[in-house]
């Protein structure tokens, strides 16, 4: 292989490594490249699965990251609400206070 071929091949390898590393750094919740966490509407609300946005991109030509982030925010809100309810229930009974 001549020098020009080696230079082009090495630039291709280096740029691929940089892109993969950049995607890994900027991924959300451990998602990597085109694997994106999405909810499966057919299953219970508490379960999440990895969805392939790559396939849906071919169906409609777009990938809406904002919708995925909104789903994550909604799930966090449900967890916080559930946590508050459990805390209120645990402090509501057996506190040792005399109520008249």
UniProtKB/Swiss-Prot annotation:
Location in the cell: Golgi apparatus, Golgi stack membrane
Ranges that cross the membrane: 7-27
Keyword annotations of the record: Golgi apparatus, Membrane, Signal-anchor, Transmembrane, Transmembrane helix
Cellular compartments per GO CC: Golgi cisterna; Golgi cisterna membrane
Membrane topology: Single-pass type II membrane protein
Topological domain spans for side Cytoplasmic: 1-6
Keyword Transcription: no
Any one Gene Ontology BP term: leukotriene D4 biosynthetic process
Family: Belongs to the glycosyltransferase 6 family.
Name of the protein this chain belongs to: Inactive N-acetyllactosaminide alpha-1,3-galactosyltransferase
Source organism (scientific name): Homo sapiens (Human)
Name of the gene: GGTA1
